[in-house]
């Protein structure tokens, strides 16, 4: 089977896409996968590093309010459709799958116009702009929440859950030795989504010394964008600061408490693994859905 899968921007879209890829490869090991992402977001480095073919489209996000920027976005979208058609014709997939993010819009639209089978997946409890638009051009829509079925055509919506749940259960737990923390202490994991949060990072580092001499270890995942600002910061011996963790479920499996955003994929993993958690919902998401 030949599959094109597209997702971009944040781990909340990328990791469900990877979970689907893993399932496809598990069922049909000889399947060929082509991933289409953006030119400037985290997937452009992550996906090739995992050994998958990667093509990039230049896309911009559509503002929910009417602005001049949206004119540029539409122009960019038209160019991206043209390029997506070229990629799809060349690869000739059996199916094209979109897991969210602006990059999926030109890919799924182009695929439908070329007569390819299409499927999109909506992870969130509030449907994103891209998937609302794409629902008229796709064959089926997978949703994580029963409440979002009503937002899509009745003959297309399927309650699938979040693909990350199953993947989280299948990933092998890491060890505290590998993480470089005390194996005899409980572990607190602080991570504000795949991109991190400047405001939360700043707040945590304002009291990081209070962790000193506590009977637990702390791992702070800053996000790649913020790591340079704090990597030289002196922290207590029981605190470890890292920019990013790829196989987050492997760490979550040995975590005693997680402090995190309330993203759909993260919550699916936490629920599947039964990790105690404190949520700090992001205020910068569509319709405050976290």
Region annotations inferred by a language model:
Residues 109, 249, 267-273:
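Short alpha-helical segment that forms part of, or immediately flanks, the ligand-binding pocket
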Residues 52, 116-117, 256-257, 274-282:
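Structural loop-to-beta junction motif characteristic of Rossmann-like glycosyltransferase folds
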Residues 41, 46, 50, 173-175, ...:
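Donor-nucleotide binding loops and adjacent catalytic segments primarily
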Residues 83-96, 103-119, 132-140:
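Glycosyltransferases and closely related glycan-assembly transferases
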Residues 93-95, 239, 245, 253-266, ...:
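Acidic donor-binding loop of glycosyltransferase active sites
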Residues 13-25:
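Short amphipathic alpha-helix
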Residues 3-8, 27-76, 81, 160:
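Conserved nucleotide-sugar phosphate-binding/catalytic loop shared by glycosyltransferases and other
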Residues 42, 53, 112-173:
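Active-site-proximal region of nucleotide-activated glycan assembly enzymes
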């Amino acid at each position: 089977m030949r599959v094109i899968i597209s997702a971009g921007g944040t781990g909340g879209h990328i990791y469900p896409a990877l979970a689907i890829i893993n399932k496809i490869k598990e069922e049909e090991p000889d399947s060929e996968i082509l991933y289409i992402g953006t030119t400037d977001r985290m997937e452009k480095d992550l996906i090739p590093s995992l050994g998958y073919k990667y093509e990039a489209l230049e896309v911009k996000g559509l503002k929910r309010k009417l602005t001049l920027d949206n004119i540029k976005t539409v122009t960019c979208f038209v160019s991206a459709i043209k390029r997506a058609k070229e990629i799809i014709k060349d690869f000739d997939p059996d199916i094209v799958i979109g897991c969210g993010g602006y990059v999926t819009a030109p890919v799924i639209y182009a695929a439908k116009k070329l007569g390819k089978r299409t499927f999109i997946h909506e992870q969130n409890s509030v449907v994103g702009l891209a998937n609302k638009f794409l629902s008229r051009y796709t064959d089926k829509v997978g949703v994580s929440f029963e409440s979002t079925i009503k937002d899509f055509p009745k003959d297309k919506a399927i309650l699938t859950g979040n693909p990350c749940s199953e993947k989280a259960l299948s990933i092998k737990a890491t060890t505290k030795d590998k993480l470089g923390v005390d194996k005899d202490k409980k572990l607190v994991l602080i991570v504000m989504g795949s991109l991190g949060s400047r405001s939360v990072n700043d707040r945590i580092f304002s009291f990081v010394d209070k962790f000193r001499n506590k009977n637990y270890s702390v791992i702070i995942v800053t996000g790649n964008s913020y790591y340079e600002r704090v990597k030289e910061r002196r922290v207590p011996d029981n605190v470890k600061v890292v920019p990013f963790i790829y196989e987050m479920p492997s760490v979550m499996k040995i975590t005693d408490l997680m402090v995190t955003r309330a993203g759909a994929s993260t919550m699916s993993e936490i629920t599947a693994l039964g990790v105690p958690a404190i949520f700090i919902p992001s205020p910068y998401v569509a319709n405050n859905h976290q």
